[in-house]
């Protein structure tokens, strides 16, 4: 085990470990988020629209990055994917002729607007991201 000879060296050693832990957390959290988002398709069968699969392919992540005394990663759903497909079956049931991608993703998450699927995937993902981060930091900084 390396011994720091100065506070600056100690800080660098700690930040290197935090960066490694956050890189591990990001990898696990990204996979868990993909699994949760894909689970949306495990329930419900739409009758007035055809699933595009865009939600399931929308998970994006940035690798761990450091700046000063902080390390972070970001996981999000890419809402720039186009789902603006007019659907006359929607208007005949009182819905708008189309929904924007953010509206579709929000309806899928909340289980509203007639969107069929296992809702709550983002809330579950968020909890797993926190847990994955805690687990990774605990693994790297566990007392021995």
Would you name each region that the model predicts?
Residues 79-93:
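Short, surface-exposed beta-strand/loop "edge" segments at domain boundaries and coil↔beta transitions
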Residues 1-76, 93, 97-144:
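Short, Lys/Arg-rich flexible segments
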